[in-house]
Amino acid sequence: MTDKPTLSICVPSRNRQIYFQKTIEGLLRNKRTDVEFIFTDNSDDPAIMNDFMADIVKDPRIVYLPTTDKVLSMMDNWERAAHASQGEWVVFIGDDDFVEPDVAGLILRITEVSPDIEALAWGALSYFWPVDGEMAGSVTVPFDHSVIRVPKADLMRRMFGWHEPTSVPTSGFSIYHSAVRRCLLERIYTKYNHRYFEHAVVDYDMAMKVIVEGKGFAFSQRPFSMFGACPQSNSFSIGRLEDTKERARIFMEEFGTNFEENEALRNFPFSSFLGCTATIGVVQQWFRKTYKVDLAGWEKGYAKACALNTESYRDKDAFDVISAGYETAFRNWQGGRFLKHYQPVWRGNMPMIEMSGATSSGMMVRSDIAGATTPAELWNVVSAMMIAPQDILVRPTGLRFLDEEASASGELTRLPGGNPAGTSGKAISGKPSPMRNAPNSRAGGR
């Protein structure tokens, strides 16, 4: 391994050893030497991962942090992973996810021509681990592979103003499935109470800090990672009422305190038990009040996002319970002014359809193609359908904004959440931006 890794890939885990092990095996198939792997276990039984790692840890690229003598909150488990990292750039993924280590090569080429870039996001695919009795899903491999510069003002508007939201802000740029430069991380650590992660909802905590403190942002339409959803993950529970409630209960229990009792939330009557949008609203309200960061007029967009969150519940009884909870919160918030913007529609139990083939945006591929049973195995197939990382065009004169990059498709360019990555501020004629609802928050116990 090189003395100073280009990229540290951090993978924290808790009590999901079988998925953690498969993810580790998939990552280590890449022999790149300028990448460092930080694997942190936080499980009740330390022996499982300790035995698994006994020989693997001999790889000089690996830093393994075993379970300590007490269970850590997810926030503290992520914190120790960040402290253990040495790379010039850092990315976190979940223990049921995947990221392509060769993104390190793209990072090097980007910073050579645009040295002000401090955060890189990319398109990400979503994968549901196989479950008996459930149909295999599909992923869409995009045709576009542009790399563009993203204006900070657009990210601020999307994160804090809830501009054009899905059920989540369409800003991206967390350290989760995005790479953050060391200098930016250290500024965040110094300013925010000498911690990288201050809030239990670690991904959105960091995303807000990266957007507020970052100087230059870049986005690659070519995907470099895959969100995984195993039956024990929070993203798997989206749209399932009992799973959502149980995940929230475990999350609060392992955190050790109810973060919703924070003084900053006194007049914000939304609970994380309602779902991912309410959870994001809670952490964002804490950040707004604590650090005096705000954009006027965000409430209407937030109400629309809450409606989309509610619509993810396909069971009518679950939909009614969540809808009633949100309605009560909106009725008791700011005199009920924004209740009229919360208008969810029950979509019914829509049947799943197995789909594959070409669309205008890319190639749809079944997630079990070639017998794939893990994100890493599926990545082996779909990455062969995409341009190789070393062949992605990075202009020698520096990155340009979307409306300045003729090769970029505004229809395809996405940030996590499903909307365009942004422009220099000019309108883009004839480039529609269809929405997709793909929340992937790690608000849960790792």
Residue ranges with predicted function:
Residues M1-K245:
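Nucleotide-sugar donor-binding/catalytic module of glycosyltransferases
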Residues G123, P223-R446:
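C-terminal subregions of glycosyltransferases and related glycan-biosynthesis enzymes
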